[in-house]
Amino acid sequence: QPLLLEQLRELGIDLSAGQLNRLLIEDQHAFHMEKAQLKATGLEVSAYVQTDDTGARHQGNNGYCTYLGNEHFAWFESTASKSRINFLECLQPARRYVITAAVLAYLAERGLAACHCQVLAARGTVDFATELQWQVHLSACGVLGQRAVAVATEGALLGGLLAQGISEQLGIVSDGAQQFAILVHGLCWVHAERTFAQLIGLNENERRAIEWVRGQIWDLYDELKAYRGEPSAALKAVIEAGFEALCATETVCEPLNAALHHFHADKADLLRVLERPELPLHNNLSESDIREYVKKRKISGSTRSDEGRRCRDTFASLKKTCRKHGVSFWRYLKDRLCGTALIPPLA
């Protein structure tokens, strides 16, 4: 903003810092609405989204920015946390807390105490539009513990997401952060391999073992790329057998063996593409999209007002989406501000 003010003054425009700030962040409702529609439509028509997050300080406090997107749209939202509750809130087109039989099954799987599940089930299907209504309902059901409230809220938000028409088969591709592990979750192979790349062998045998395993991982990756292009039952069997054989390998390097054990624990998410060939094998797109946001954050620093933070998220989302569709962001802004309506809604 200071750089923009300096440039405007060099052009002969007499403007104060306060006036520029108001021009940038006030009365931007139409842009906020278009950003909201981006997400709603993107989630409705997409087979998958990729996600990531980064730090985004606000008013001197730590905060986070969550990214959702794919090759068709980009959406940024800054909040105070990066929990699974926060991610589900970001995914929802509108806030809803819904309890259904499917949600109760999710809660049981997540380890919510049977007594809490029974009480919630006895209340039947519920649908709340505000956090206050949901908290009152939890209190009435005797769900008071911190973890119990968190798990129940996750389930209710997931139920609200599905109730708004988002498919339970929506693919979520991430770097492995647990808050993103919902619906049909796929893991980034580039991130998974970094664990092995960071290992340091203490002798020549250990170094050779590490390099061999890394080579095998990238061979599997190449086979998965081939499978995405032309799925076949035969290649699927080869990949699954190769994955199992690699993870069962005992090497001379104990840290490497431990890494292989964790790698095997993520088998379902790493091999998700065998069920859903349209899913990407890496999360590079989300990292690339969020990198521009990080650059802006480094230049401008933290946000000071809530409306300023909201505007930064909105215009970052709209600008990145314009680029994905080959639309000049300046032409887009001129079209919207002048009301010519030559550029259709980005959604």
Task: Please state what every model-predicted region is.
Residues 1-347:
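Catalytic center-proximal scaffold of phosphoryl-transfer enzymes
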